[in-house]
Amino acid sequence: VPPVYADLGKGARDLFSKGYNYGFSKL
């Protein structure tokens, strides 16, 4: 796996986690 792809995946996971937690806290 290319480092750039792995870094992109990590960023996407972090972003998704933040977005999910934010949306969940609003419920």
From Swiss-Prot:
GO BP terms, alphabetized: monoatomic ion transport
Signal peptide: none
Intracellular or extracellular location(s): Mitochondrion outer membrane
Domain of life: Eukaryota
Keyword Transport listed: yes
MF term (GO), any: porin activity
GO cellular component: mitochondrial outer membrane; pore complex
InterPro entries the UniProt entry points to: Porin_dom_sf
Swiss-Prot/TrEMBL keywords: Ion transport, Membrane, Mitochondrion, Mitochondrion outer membrane, Porin, Transmembrane, Transmembrane beta strand, Transport
Tissues where this protein is expressed: Photoreceptors.
Function: Forms a channel through the cell membrane that allows diffusion of small hydrophilic molecules.
Quaternary structure (record): Interacts with hexokinases.
Description of its domains: Consists mainly of membrane-spanning sided beta-sheets.
Family, per entry: Belongs to the eukaryotic mitochondrial porin family.
Name the record gives this protein: Voltage-dependent anion-selective channel protein
Species of provenance: Doryteuthis pealeii (Longfin inshore squid)
Biological classification of the source: Eukaryota, Metazoa, Spiralia, Lophotrochozoa, Mollusca
